[in-house]
Design a protein with these regions (language model features):
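Catalytic cores of large soluble enzymes that bind and process phosphate-bearing ligands
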Residues: 10, 54, 58, 208, ...
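Helix-centered, glycine/charged polyanion-binding patches within enzymatic domains
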Residues: 156-157, 162-242
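Polybasic low-complexity intrinsically disordered regions
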Residues: 16, 20-23, 32-37, 41-175, ...
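Alpha-helical support elements that line or immediately flank enzyme active sites
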Residues: 2-12
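Short helix-capping/linker segments at secondary-structure and domain boundaries
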Residues: 10-17, 130, 227-232
Length: 250
């Protein structure tokens, strides 16, 4: 059933679509370990299994298990982290059983644009861009408010955009014993660079920070563009968080 769930996530299918897909596609059946004579799980069975995974937050556990395997294989060699956050929009329609919008979703602003939904906070390593941790909250949370949850104590350097300016001075980081050894390579606000030439040393330093930090944007591109998860699928942050964590594993 777990393989069926991963297939459903990878191909962005509803429960009925997944049931039909297993009937029609022999390769999918083989991947799921189903012989031709085996009974194919119907949509209610697929739904119940997904609810079981959500109840025990197994999406997060699977992500941690995969990361442990990557670390033990020596693929994450750096103690640097890149942090960033991105909005996941929530449907504005009230055409549902309660005739209300999801109470866990909220509105947040980026630049001059308002977003209604939730926010995905992510940390990756600074060499390959592998997701090392992720937390989720309402859209009105500031990016920096969840940064401490993303960064392990042994982290030596942290990259982030201008939304994380002053991160190292926050109380939750000051109580960290390793904070004194850590460097925070945070991009300056755009206005600071105004009027500086392309050859200016400060601008070159900022360009280097951005060239490292762009790796975390690939995570958002995969989730929101390749996997088409621009909008929430379910009501509540926890259910959507489970699906996004599973997407990162896939």
């Amino acid at each position: 059933m777990l393989r069926i769930h991963l297939l459903q996530i990878a191909y962005n299918m509803s429960d009925p679509q997944m049931g039909d897909f297993l009937h029609e596609n022999s390769t999918a059946r083989k991947f799921a370990g189903l012989a031709l004579a085996d009974r194919t799980p119907d949509e209610s069975t697929i739904l119940q299994f997904r609810h079981l995974l959500e109840k025990h937050d197994l999406g997060k556990q699977v992500l941690e298990l995969v990361n442990d395997g990557i670390t033990s294989a020596g693929l994450v060699l750096s103690k640097g982290r890149i942090v960033d956050a991105s909005f996941i929009e929530a449907p504005s329609s009230t055409k549902n059983r309660d005739h209300k919008r999801d109470p866990e979703m909220s509105s947040g602003k980026k630049g001059n644009t308002w977003h209604v939904g939730m926010k995905m906070h992510v940390a990756t390593d600074d060499i390959i861009g592998i997701v090392t941790s992720a937390v989720y909250g309402p859209a009105n949370e500031h990016d920096i408010s969840r940064a401490r949850e993303l960064i392990p104590s042994e982290t030596e350097q942290v990259y982030g955009d201008a939304g994380y300016v002053g991160m190292g001075k926050r109380e939750e980081f000051q109580t960290d014993k390793e904070a004194e050894k850590r460097s925070y390579r945070i991009n300056l606000r755009p206005g600071v660079l105004k009027g500086r030439s392309a050859e200016d040393l400060i601008r070159k330093i900022e360009h280097f920070k951005s060239s490292v930090r762009c790796k975390v944007e690939h995570v958002f591109a995969r989730v929101k563009l390749q996997m088409s998860y621009r909008k929430t699928r379910y009501r509540g942050i926890a259910k959507n968080a489970h699906r996004i964590n599973t997407l990162k594993v896939v």
